[in-house]
Amino acid sequence: MPLDPSPTLNSLGFAKPPAETRVVVAMSGGVDSSVVAAMLAEEGYDVVGVTLQLYDHGAALAKKGACCAGLDIHDARRVSEKMGFPHYVLDYENIFKDAVIDEFAESYLGGATPVPCIRCNERVKFKDLLETAKDLDADCMATGHYIQRKSGPYGAELHSAADANRDQSYFLFSTTPEQLAFLRFPLGHLPSKEDTRALAEKYGLSVANKPDSQDICFVPDGDYASVIRKLRPEAAAPGDIVDTDGRVLARHDGVVNYTIGQRRGLGIGGLATPLYVIKLDAEARQVVVGPKSMLSTRTVPVREINWLGDEPFQSRDAWHLAVKVRSTRPPTDAIIRPISDTEATVELTSPEEGISPGQACVFYDTDSSRIYGGGWIHKG
């Protein structure tokens, strides 16, 4: 008797009907996650929407371009009511403050330029929320991120989004293989954000024309300095602006007001050569400035590496990959030399300016859209 053919997989990769496949959708209240939830509900999946209350407890009701607070929660609930699936709001404010906001402030005090969105994905959404999804007996968790999950010979692989302008791989490099096995990203293959909004119109969602979220969600109007001053008043302590020889050039009103690579607003005039911020020394309360040439570097120390390759990270003396050292910059060719399973020296083929501790260094394949993980840039 011939063997039965392999069972047909549904669109989420499970060998059972959508109605028997439970998927928790992480809903921020924006158009992306709303479309994911509506799309899966339309396909007949057993959808459960979950929104995290991360901050403000409603104080941001009227804030535009935020997520996970105030009106966004109501928007997510309206989508669930329209599409007919349950929706839950979980209070994660304390977890979010401890895991993301406090570290954001501490990192800045330490002279780094942190990326809190990565820590939020790593420590809140893809950790605690993912465990909540499992507690709800979900088969998987779906999000509205623009990134792709593809099946490879050794398991699920992380790939850049089809729309390079919307690609969020820089913010998701720390996704572990175990998390990736459970996650789904239904929007990653779409050619453009216009396609997402067209789907929102198709499903009749009220968020179809809602603006995209901007900046850091817990920072009003992009004024991160005010948030840090509130959390850590010592960040506003005045100090000296000095050159690389320690010569005092001016005074400043808190290192929190400066970033690596900054030129304007230093209060230094009359010099033949323009000066840029090249280092922040929060402990000494010093802003160190120097010529633009000192912003360039080819060697980047990276730690806390999350490796997503098929071979062990230390199986080679060097990996020839492309890396991103800022979310807004394209990948550049580099040689990655492992020091341990979680630490490496990255040698850039071409020097980059303004590389700052606290930023991520994300690894990409040079011949495909695959992401090989990444790590955090540390002080040399």
From Swiss-Prot:
Disulfide pattern: 120-217
Region annotation (Interaction with tRNA) ranges: 166-168
Keywords tagged on the record: ATP-binding, Cytoplasm, Disulfide bond, Nucleotide-binding, RNA-binding, Transferase, tRNA processing, tRNA-binding
Catalytic activity: S-sulfanyl-L-cysteinyl-[protein] + uridine(34) in tRNA + AH2 + ATP = 2-thiouridine(34) in tRNA + L-cysteinyl-[protein] + A + AMP + diphosphate + H(+)
Protein EC: 2.8.1.13
InterPro entries: MnmA-like, MnmA-like_C, MnmA-like_central, MnmA-like_central_sf, Rossmann-like_a/b/a_fold
Active site: 120 (nucleophile), 217 (cysteine persulfide intermediate)
Record GO terms (molecular function): ATP binding; tRNA binding; tRNA-uridine 2-sulfurtransferase activity
Summary of the function given for this chain in its UniProt record: Catalyzes the 2-thiolation of uridine at the wobble position (U34) of tRNA, leading to the formation of s(2)U34.
Organism name: Roseobacter denitrificans (strain ATCC 33942 / OCh 114) (Erythrobacter sp. (strain OCh 114))
Record: residues binding ATP: 26-33, 52, 144
Pfam name, any one: tRNA_Me_trans
GO cellular component terms given for this protein: cytoplasm
One of the GO BP terms on file: tRNA wobble position uridine thiolation
Transmembrane segments: none
Subcellular location, principal: cytoplasm
Entry's family note: Belongs to the MnmA/TRMU family.
Residues annotated as site: Interaction with tRNA: 145, 359
Subcellular compartments: Cytoplasm
Stated name of the protein: tRNA-specific 2-thiouridylase MnmA
Source domain of life: Bacteria
